Amino acid sequence: MNKPIGYWIKRLDAALEGHLDATLARLRLSRRQWQTLNVLAESPLSPGQLEGILNPLWGSDKRLRENELAALVGHGLIIMIDDRITLSESGHAKYLEAQRIVEESRKDLSMGIGIDEYAMALSVLERMTLNAERLAR
């Protein structure tokens, strides 16, 4: 019997999170810390802007967010300049190192999946998500 898509989505999500956590642990980064470095690599942001971007990924647990940001500050990876949070020099180096191992991991995860198959899967998931969100209103 085929499992419903929700089963596979939840199973994939849990497996991806576990794999990413293990991958990033080699650099002593949490997934949320990496997400923060990844966002800040694009440009410095105000605390409110950063919160707005990270909320969909992290949820609304303010204490968790504060702890993760405090750890990044404590390790000298992010700094505040002109009321904006930005990567420090060592933060940028850590981001590049993490980006490299995450890319290697992504290649391993998508082994045997063609570019067109991957694009189609993303397209289908996006449309299903939008449909479900519309119907939930």
Question: Where would I find each of the regions flagged by the language model?
Answer:
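C-terminal regulatory/oligomerization modules of transcriptional regulators
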Residues: 45-47, 119-137
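N-terminal helix-turn-helix DNA-binding core of bacterial DNA-binding proteins
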Residues: 18-64, 69
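Charged, amphipathic alpha-helical coiled-coil/dimerization segments
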Residues: 70-123
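Conserved N-terminal beta-strand and adjoining loop/helix that marks the start
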Residues: 1-16, 31-39
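Structural signal for well-ordered, non-membrane alpha-helices
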Residues: 17, 21, 103-106, 110, ...
